[in-house]
């Protein structure tokens, strides 16, 4: 029997003020999943003596987030995970997951809530320490109006898609990465966002497969601390509906999207 339990999506907004009047905001949802064999009796016998209530977990996350002295989502998850294991020895392992609520800075004290792409992270810890840390950026939407093609693909009686030598390309993308040493040298998801956008801008791709492969290789070249990268990219490119000189209209007649995945590991 394999068991786990925990608390999902605890919302918190952490604000830190500095002497120069500048404020930093770290807003996110945090989930905790507790793993271990010490909770069997709660399932098999209804014996809750070893059970840490999920409401207690919520309170722990909120209170211990105040004590965190860093400024990254990854660091906060590791801080909380270690705190759970130290405070509750009955927990054999914990998996902490965080999803950023993105606030973009407008001034030293003013921020705007953005609903687009956001950072994510997962940290798994056991008695031996940090087992794995995975960072990511999800819901990234990128549109490139020229500099992409899709030609020379397999054709048969079912194929109606025309070849396009130069096309707009509109993608939705999630990307995650793991570290060679999860304890140090973390890569910020905003930096990854900028690298992906730069690659999309200057690389002339023959397909989305070609594009994500180039993105992954550039990430591995830039950040030697990354051990593995995984992409999930959806093709949201619209179909042409009209053209008049330099003006073009595109539409989206079908809701189905192509899905392309890739995992690259450092050799």
Question: What does each of the following model-derived ranges do?
Answer:
Residues 1-267:
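N-terminal intrinsically disordered, cationic/polar leader segments
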């Amino acid at each position: 029997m394999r068991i786990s339990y925990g608390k999902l999506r605890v919302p918190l907004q952490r604000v830190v003020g500095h002497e120069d009047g500048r404020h930093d905001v770290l807003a996110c949802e945090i989930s905790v999943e507790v793993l271990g064999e010490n909770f069997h009796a709660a399932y098999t016998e209804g014996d809750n003596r070893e059970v840490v209530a999920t409401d207690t977990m919520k309170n722990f996350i909120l209170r211990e987030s105040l004590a965190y002295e860093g400024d990254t989502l990854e660091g906060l998850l590791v801080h909380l995970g270690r705190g759970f294991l130290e405070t509750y020895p009955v927990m054999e392992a914990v998996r902490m997951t965080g999803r950023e609520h993105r606030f973009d800075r407008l001034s030293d004290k003013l921020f705007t809530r953005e609903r687009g792409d956001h950072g994510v992270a997962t940290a798994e810890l056991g008695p031996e320490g940090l087992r794995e840390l995975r960072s990511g950026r999800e819901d990234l939407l990128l549109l490139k109006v020229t500099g992409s093609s899709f030609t020379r693909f397999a054709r048969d009686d079912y194929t109606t898609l025309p070849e396009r030598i130069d096309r707009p390309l509109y993608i939705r993308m999630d990307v995650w990465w793991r570290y060679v040493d999860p304890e140090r040298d973390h890569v910020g998801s905003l930096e990854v966002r900028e690298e992906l956008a730069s690659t999309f801008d200057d690389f002339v791709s023959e397909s989305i497969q070609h594009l994500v492969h180039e993105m992954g290789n550039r990430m591995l070249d830039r950040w030697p601390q990354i051990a593995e990268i995984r992409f999930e990219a959806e093709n949201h490119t619209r179909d042409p509906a009209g053209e008049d000189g330099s003006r073009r209209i595109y539409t989206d007649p079908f809701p189905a999207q192509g899905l392309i995945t890739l995992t690259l590991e450092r050799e």
